[in-house]
A protein has these predicted regions:
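Short, surface-exposed acidic-centric catalytic microdomains
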Residues: 30-91
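Short, hydrophobic/glycine-enriched beta-strand segments
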Residues: 19-25
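Short catalytic/ligand-binding loop motif for oxyanion handling, primarily in non-cytosolic enzymes
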Residues: 29-32, 83-86, 120-123, 143-147
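Short loop/turn segments at strand-loop or loop-helix junctions that form parts
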Residues: 25, 78-80, 140
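A general structural signal for short secondary-structure boundary/capping elements
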Residues: 66-71, 118-126
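Internal catalytic-core helix/loop-beta-alpha segment
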Residues: 70-118
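C-terminal capping/extension of enzyme domains
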Residues: 1-19, 41, 88-97, 101, ...
C-alpha cells in the first residue's frame, strides 16, 4: 500500500459548554467516506460513549453531534495533515498538527483525553507545548485494538465521566 497525503476534512465538534475534549489521530478511510468521526462500523467509540452516558447509540451525524453537545463533549483530532498508508496509525509521518487553542479559549474544557497511544504521543509532541495542558491517554476504540474487550474499554473510559 502506498502512502497518501491526507488533510483533515472535518471541523471540530464543540461549543462554549464543552467540558472535555477527546482527540483522535485523524479520520480513518471509513470515517472520511462517511464524512464524520469514528465512522468505521467496528469502531467502538459511539457505542462506548452511549453506554457510559446511558444514551441510545447514535446512528446519524446529527444524533452523534446531539449526544456530544448534550453531554458537553468536544471531539477533534491531533493531526491536520500527514502521510499515511490506509488507516494505519503506525504508518503516520510528515505530521502537521491541528491547533486546538481556539477550542480551549472559547469553551469550558476541564480535561483533554486522547483516543489511543498514537494520539497520546502526537499530542505530547505537538499540542502540549502550545497548551500546557496534560492529556489523559485512553485505550483506542479502534477495531485494530482487539486486545481490549468492550467491557475493559468501558471501565477505562469511565474516567471521562468525572469531568462531565
Amino acid at each position: 500500500m502506498e502512502y497518501e497525503h491526507i488533510t483533515h476534512s472535518f471541523e471540530p465538534v464543540y461549543d462554549e459548554n464543552s467540558r472535555i475534549l477527546i482527540l483522535g489521530t485523524l479520520p480513518s478511510v471509513a470515517s472520511r467516506e462517511n464524512n464524520f468521526y469514528y465512522g468505521h462500523k467496528q469502531n467502538r467509540f459511539w457505542k462506548l460513549l452511549a453506554y457510559l452516558l446511558d444514551e441510545p447509540v447514535p446512528e446519524t451525524i446529527d444524533e452523534k453531534k446531539y449526544m456530544l453537545f448534550k453531554n458537553h463533549i468536544a471531539i477533534w483530532d491531533v493531526i491536520q495533515s500527514c502521510d499515511i498508508k490506509g488507516s494505519s496509525d503506525n504508518s503516520i509521518k510528515n505530521v502537521r498538527p491541528t491547533d486546538i487553542r481556539k477550542i480551549l479559549e472559547t469553551s469550558d474544557i476541564k480535561q483533554i483525553y486522547v483516543n489511543g497511544n498514537k494520539a497520546g504521543a502526537l499530542y505530547k509532541k505537538y499540542q502540549l507545548p502550545l497548551t500546557g495542558m496534560e492529556a489523559v491517554t485512553l485505550p483506542s476504540t479502534s477495531p485494530a485494538n482487539a486486545a481490549w474487550s468492550f467491557e475493559r474499554l468501558c471501565e477505562a473510559w469511565s474516567r471521562i465521566l468525572v469531568n462531565l
